[in-house]
């Protein structure tokens, strides 16, 4: 019987240096994570440019992808933040495309899932919250701080409500980043373990290979499920971004 091949489900999340770089004593190396982030940006740009270059009454595949993506994000943003929120469309659309493609590319063998890194997801979440705070203060001034003081609250309870709202606001980037990070991490680990189990059965030969088709079918089904999760997590991240942006656009609502 063949020796079982050890498969480490965590190794796929290891960050490797491609080009070692140091600046003022700080490691700023170009890594596999940075490489695949560039790939994601390039891929999104190519698809959208190709899809919007030549318009036709009967759209091709790339034009259909571009149009459906545009309409989907535009309707989501308008429903969450109203017409005034449409000024954030380029920002929200970029967030959705980046997260969705990052999730999808991570399912391709020998690639890297950048959204499985808490530093990446937390960075995205901080960009969202930072945009909300900066725009809210510039547009509404101190009136923006009214989001921490709900109207109609008794003056006796107001200090407690302000404290609760502040804690809730501070926790937004934490929950936003952990939700995406944890789902991508757990899904890819499970997929790797299941794939390793199937490979082990096939490599063992004899009677073990006869039962391999069952777990193999489960891997195929779980991969399809992960494709759905890739979209759902991008959608959840996007819809929450729209909801948070609504605080900056309409701080009194």
UniProtKB/Swiss-Prot annotation:
PROSITE patterns: ATPASE_A. Keywords: ATP synthesis, Cell inner membrane, Cell membrane, CF(0), Hydrogen ion transport, Ion transport, Membrane, Transmembrane, Transmembrane helix, Transport. It is a multi-pass membrane protein. One of its GO terms (molecular function) is proton-transporting ATP synthase activity, rotational mechanism. It is found in: Cell inner membrane. The chain crosses the membrane at residues 30-50, 88-108, 118-138, 144-164, 184-204, 211-231. It comes from the Bacteria. The keyword tRNA processing does not apply. It holds the Pfam family ATP-synt_A. One of its GO terms (cellular component) is plasma membrane. PANTHER family: ATP SYNTHASE SUBUNIT A. Belongs to the ATPase A chain family. NCBIfam families: ATP_synt_6_or_A, PRK05815.2-4. Key component of the proton channel; it plays a direct role in the translocation of protons across the membrane. F-type ATPases have 2 components, CF(1) - the catalytic core - and CF(0) - the membrane proton channel. CF(1) has five subunits: alpha(3), beta(3), gamma(1), delta(1), epsilon(1). CF(0) has three main subunits: a(1), b(2) and c(9-12). The alpha and beta chains form an alternating ring which encloses part of the gamma chain. CF(1) is attached to CF(0) by a central stalk formed by the gamma and epsilon chains, while a peripheral stalk is formed by the delta and b chains. This is ATP synthase subunit a. The gene is atpB.
């Amino acid at each position: 019987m063949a020796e079982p091949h050890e498969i480490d489900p965590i190794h796929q999340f290891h960050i490797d240096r491609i080009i070692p770089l140091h600046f003022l004593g700080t490691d700023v190396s170009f890594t596999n994570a940075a490489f695949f982030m560039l790939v994601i940006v390039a891929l999104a740009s190519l698809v959208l440019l190709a899809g919007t270059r030549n318009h036709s009454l009967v759209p091709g595949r790339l034009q259909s992808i571009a149009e459906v993506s545009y309409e989907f994000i535009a309707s989501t943003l308008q429903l969450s933040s109203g017409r005034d929120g449409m000024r954030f469309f380029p920002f929200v659309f970029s967030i959705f495309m980046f997260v969705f493609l990052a999730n999808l590319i991570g399912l391709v063998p020998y690639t890297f899932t950048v959204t499985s890194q808490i530093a990446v997801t937390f960075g995205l979440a901080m960009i969202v919250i930072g945009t909300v705070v900066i725009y809210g203060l510039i547009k509404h001034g101190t009136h923006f701080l009214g989001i921490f003081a709900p109207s109609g609250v008794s003056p006796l309870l107001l200090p407690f409500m302000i404290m609760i709202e502040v804690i809730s606001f501070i926790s937004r980037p934490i929950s936003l980043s952990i939700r995406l990070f944890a789902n991508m991490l757990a899904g890819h680990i499970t997929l790797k373990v299941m794939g390793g189990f199937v490979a082990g059965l096939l490599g063992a030969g004899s009677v073990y290979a006869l039962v391999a088709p069952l777990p193999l079918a489960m891997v195929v089904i779980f991969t399809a499920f992960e494709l759905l999760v890739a979209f759902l997590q991008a959608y959840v991240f996007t819809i929450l971004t729209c909801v948070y942006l609504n605080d900056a656009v309409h701080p009194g609502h």
